[in-house]
């Protein structure tokens, strides 16, 4: 993480309102287990690694193609030293443009035709073991050790189609604000989410806790009924309030004193299949801190850990 911080500081991108917000830089992921490099209390626990992928992997993107779906416009961007490499940048842009104009070989990205049922998925936990972990978590809550914890399990399934087909299916069936497809040679990452971990823009920090979910209604009346059921559910409200407080505490670790505020509370966001309850926490980051400091303060999201966060993650490891 220190290396990434130093690398980021070595780049000074010129802001241009005509360019997309992302115009080059690091693209990749931090896995959940990166928390062991951040929190000392979790450094020595080591659950088995069942998939054998790196804890973090990033690509430095110095040649970027950004397609604006709304404007039907393609941006080609090259990162170079503005003073000394302008002619080289133009040459690379020409090469990239020529490459994009070449015809592509035919590839079948259609989704596989076979039918998949829930029974085809393989759990890394097992039903009885998972139920036992839930009961144990409830005991911790009753004893006052934690307020909430997110029990989860990995589900796996053999997949023979092209990962692009999976990404396209997700875009069609369950589009979300944040969707991703990463081809990392040895493996691919495909997914979608309505949620950010944190955002840093012009010194302004934003986190958006999401907790509370209902299905979309069959019609407008049913949809509104689902919304009312969610916002009047004491369990959903209690969980959401805990995550707002967790977000405030996380952001407060790197924020200017007195700058943390909740700018939206219990908002409703609707997606293709579900609706969520969402709040917004904002602050101003301290002048001597960076995006990596913000990451360390907020990772992982409370929605995949619990509250208090560190104790909840100790219980997840257990």
What are these regions (language model features)?
Residues 1-318:
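Extended alpha-helical targeting/anchoring segments
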């Amino acid at each position: 993480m220190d290396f990434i911080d130093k690398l980021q500081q070595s780049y000074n991108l010129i802001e241009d309102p005509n360019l997309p917000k992302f115009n080059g830089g690091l693209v990749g992921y931090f896995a959940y287990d990166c928390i062991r490099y951040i929190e000392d209390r979790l450094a020595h626990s080591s659950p088995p690694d069942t998939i054998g992928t790196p804890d973090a992997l990033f690509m430095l993107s110095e040649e970027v193609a950004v397609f604006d779906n709304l404007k039907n416009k393609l941006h080609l961007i090259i990162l170079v030293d503005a003073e000394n490499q302008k002619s080289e940048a133009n040459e690379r842009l020409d090469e990239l443009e020529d490459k994009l104009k070449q015809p592509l070989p035919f590839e079948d990205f259609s989704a596989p035709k076979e039918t998949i049922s829930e029974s085809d998925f393989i759990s890394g936990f097992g039903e009885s073991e998972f139920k036992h972990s839930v009961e144990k978590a409830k005991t911790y809550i009753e004893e006052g050790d934690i307020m909430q914890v997110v029990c989860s399990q990995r589900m796996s399934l053999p997949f023979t189609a092209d990962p692009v087909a999976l990404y396209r299916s997700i875009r069609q069936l369950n589009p979300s604000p944040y969707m991703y497809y990463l081809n990392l040679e040895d493996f691919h990452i495909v997914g979608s989410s309505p949620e950010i971990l944190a955002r840093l823009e012009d010194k302004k920090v934003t986190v958006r806790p999401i907790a509370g979910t209902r299905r979309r209604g069959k019609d407008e009346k049913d949809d509104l009924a689902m919304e009312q059921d969610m916002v009047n559910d004491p369990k959903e409200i209690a969980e959401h309030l805990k995550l707002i407080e967790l977000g405030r505490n996380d952001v407060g670790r790197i924020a200017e004193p007195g700058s943390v505020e909740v700018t939206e509370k219990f908002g409703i966001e609707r997606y293709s299949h579900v609706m969520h309850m969402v709040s917004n926490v904002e602050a101003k980051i301290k002048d001597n801190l960076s995006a990596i400091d913000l990451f360390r303060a907020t990772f992982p999201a409370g929605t995949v850990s619990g509250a208090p966060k560190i104790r909840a993650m100790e219980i997840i490891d257990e």
